[in-house]
Amino acid sequence: FMKGNFGFASTLLDTLKKHHNTCPVMLSSSAQASLTGRFGNSEYGRSKKAGEDLFLQYGKDTGAKVLVYRFPNLYGKWCRPNYNSAVATFCNNIANDLPIQVNDPRVELELLYIDDLVDEMIHALKGEEHRCEFEGLDVHPLVDGRYCYCPVTHKVTLGEIVDLLHQFAGMPKTLMIPEIPAGSF
């Protein structure tokens, strides 16, 4: 992970420095970079945190605008099962009558819908990104924060996700549409 995350970031920023290019740069990081809770021993998280630190230092050294996003779990169209989305994996497996594994249905995930991420990227391109500081996994909005965030996310347990997906899968048999309250994931 370190080579892919930190190594690429280092190569990119060194190249920009070499050519005196102070264009804005954005890093797609991960909630795992918090290195707190279940992410405390994450090699992936350490590599993402190293990339963040490199980008933030680059901004201080060059004056370039730096946007570091710590994205939570993404879901929605274009997510790939068994690769980048637990929700996509569950959808795929339930739709294809494959087993799913949930060790603890009470585990809460913070989900970010892909369209909400795209909306934030458009804001960032316009110079209207949402800035913050992080305390562990908690976002603290702050106009001059070092980090950026997507303001629309959804917190839900693994059990709730699986229950809802099973309800959708059962629709042809039950002819019932699951209740989807406003603002739900």
What are these regions (language model features)?
Residues A50, L54-Y58, F90, I161, ...:
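Hydrophobic alpha-helix immediately C-terminal to the catalytic Tyr-X-X-X-Lys motif of short-chain
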Residues L56-V68, P72-L109, I114-G127:
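NAD(P)-dependent short-chain dehydrogenase/reductase
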Residues H123, G127-F185:
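Mid/C-terminal beta-alpha module of Rossmann-like enzyme folds, strongest
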